[in-house]
Amino acid sequence: AEGDDPAKAAFDSLQASATEYIGYAWAMVVVIVGATIGIKLFKKFASKAS
């Protein structure tokens, strides 16, 4: 059991980091998708206005 502890600690740390990065990745995805939709809507309204 002693040999498993360092590996388990490293894995737990890696898992915590991965969860944190996935959270950042989702935030970026939301921003990018929101910006893309915003740009498309802006172009649509801009072409109607002119």
UniProtKB/Swiss-Prot annotation:
Membrane topology reported for the UniProt record: Single-pass type I membrane protein
Record text on subunit structure and interactions: Homomultimerizes. There are several thousands of this protein in the phage capsid.
Superkingdom as given in the UniProt entry: Viruses
Keyword terms, alphabetized: Capsid protein, Helical capsid protein, Host membrane, Membrane, Transmembrane, Transmembrane helix, Virion
Protein name: Capsid protein G8P
Family: Belongs to the inovirus capsid protein family.
Biological role stated in the UniProt entry: Self assembles to form a helical capsid wrapping up the viral genomic DNA. The capsid displays a filamentous structure with a length of 760-1950 nm and a width of 6-8 nm. The virion assembly and budding take place at the host inner membrane.
Keyword tRNA-binding: no
Cellular component GO terms held in the UniProt record: helical viral capsid; host cell membrane; membrane
Subcellular location: Virion; Host membrane
Transmembrane helix keyword on record: yes
Main location: virion
Regions of this protein lying in the Cytoplasmic compartment: 43-50
Membrane-crossing residue ranges in chain numbering: 22-42
Segments on the Periplasmic face: 1-21
